[in-house]
Amino acid sequence: MGNKLHIVSLGCTKNLVDTEVMMGKLQNFELTDNQSDADVIIVNTCGFIDAAKQESINTVLNLHDARKEDSVLVMAGCLSERYKEELAKDMPEVDIFTGVGDYDKIDELLVEKKSRFSEAVYLIDGAERVVTGSTYHAYIKLSEGCNQTCSFCAIPSFKGKLNSRTLDSIAKEVESLVKKGYWDFSFVSQDSSSYLRDKNVKDGLSLLIQRVELIEGVKSARILYLYPSTTSMALLKNIAKSEIFHNYFDMPIQHINDDMLRIMKRGFGKKQTLELLEFMKSLPNSFIRTSFIVGHPGESQEMFDEMCKFASSFGFERINVFAYSDEETTPAHEMSDKIAAKVINKRASILGKIAADVMQASLKKEIGKETLLVIDKESDEHEYLLSARKILWAPDIDGEIYVNDRSGEEELNFGAIYNAEITDMVGNILTATTKNASR
């Protein structure tokens, strides 16, 4: 076998961490962007909803069509885990199948050229990763699995119950990455606010915040995927007190109608959800991102209208919109009052337009303000523009800022933090003038 590797990571940032673990085990390979040159092709798949499943299958088949004759094609991750028997039967194009339990054994699988599905979900603990996409930012996994029983979600069926990493394991990984120059961290999991609850520790995230704040060299951090019913006011106050963790609140609430929240088995009603959101909004320099699902079985037009009104009026910074996907093994799959696909798509389009307007309004409020931003790279738009983001924002998902001017003579460096003024907006991209380097 040759030593050229082409690897594709689909789905969420949690998947990306697993992909980086595989890359860490294959550092003797040379990465190539050209699949037809690769000796080994790995696709880390997503099996969350229909669109993601189809993207995963199409990606694998397209790579098979383009690969050279003696290469090895590996299908890994959530889709492989969820449909291991069906895929092994229906996709002879794939040489090796593996699921969510053997990311750290990918080198062994390539030597053996055999498929493998370990029973336990892989939980990162000390494995060396090849962090991609940034020289200063990294995602850190808190846990695997989920103890929630949301009606629409199949993730626990293939990711299992909540299994949290120890504080020591996470701290060691952060410390190791800081030594390599990383200083900005996003903490992720299926349900971040339940971190350590499987170990009978109720305030796990608060303990994590305290621990990370002790690590010299960490300048910036945020927590993604908060779950409403396991997020306490005490946790929000601890985030607000932190000098490292931003007032960044990524909390997918999925709906706002009381009856719909009960049908979805979210464990929290409208009143409790609003109490959390209003408190988040009251905090200085807060940023609230959420997700909604449209077309869940039982969603009436009145319920949908209530969600639209709330989404447009509350003052979110960002909104993700998901069309309901009817997933086998979920309680919603067995419900009788399904919504027609045409209606679901129409509702997704309506709420999607509201989400776009919400983002525009949020961005417009930035014009004229001073902020801290970090410069990522040269812009793809023009050679004289630099691509940046507010240090508060999560990478890739919250937006891009074009730096088109500077007030001083100092050279601007990638991965550095600058004081800047937001000067204008072009489409949905802000422009900024840097003033001077910050911390």
Swiss-Prot record:
SUPFAM superfamilies linked to this entry: Radical SAM enzymes
Pfam families in the record: Radical_SAM, TRAM_2, UPF0004
Binding site for [4Fe-4S] cluster 2: 146, 150, 153
EC class (word): transferase
Keyword Ubl conjugation carried by entry: no
CDD domains found in the cross-reference section: Radical_SAM
EC number: 2.8.4.4
Catalytic reactions on record: L-aspartate(89)-[ribosomal protein uS12]-hydrogen + (sulfur carrier)-SH + AH2 + 2 S-adenosyl-L-methionine = 3-methylsulfanyl-L-aspartate(89)-[ribosomal protein uS12]-hydrogen + (sulfur carrier)-H + 5'-deoxyadenosine + L-methionine + A + S-adenosyl-L-homocysteine + 2 H(+)
Family according to the record: Belongs to the methylthiotransferase family. RimO subfamily.
Protein name: Ribosomal protein uS12 methylthiotransferase RimO
Organism per entry: Sulfurimonas denitrificans (strain ATCC 33889 / DSM 1251) (Thiomicrospira denitrificans (strain ATCC 33889 / DSM 1251))
